[in-house]
Amino acid sequence: MRSMSFEEAIKSLDSGIIVDIEVTPGSRSLSVPSGYNEWRKRIEVKLTRNAQKGKANEQLIESLAELFGICSSDIFISSGATSSKKSLLIKGVSYQQAVLVFGKHLKG
């Protein structure tokens, strides 16, 4: 069994968590999360929308909101809005919740 190193991409805050993500826009299929990059310490995400006019960011936020069962208004891009490497603030989600949810989807 692989170690749960994806936990390194999640940081706990008082108000929620910060998640480091690497996005591949314009993919054939939507996959949130799609894997973990252990060198960059980022959870990987594949989006079907292209990175034009914020469409991929919109899909990322909507997909994460659905994954965690929260409102998309509780998710903010704290850095990397125009980059494939992003950090997102997710309010109202604990570190333990995030590990459980991502872990369930990342176990191979």
UniProtKB/Swiss-Prot annotation:
Transmembrane segments: none annotated. InterPro entries: DUF167, YggU-like_sf. Belongs to the UPF0235 family. This is UPF0235 protein MM_0822. It holds the Pfam family DUF167.
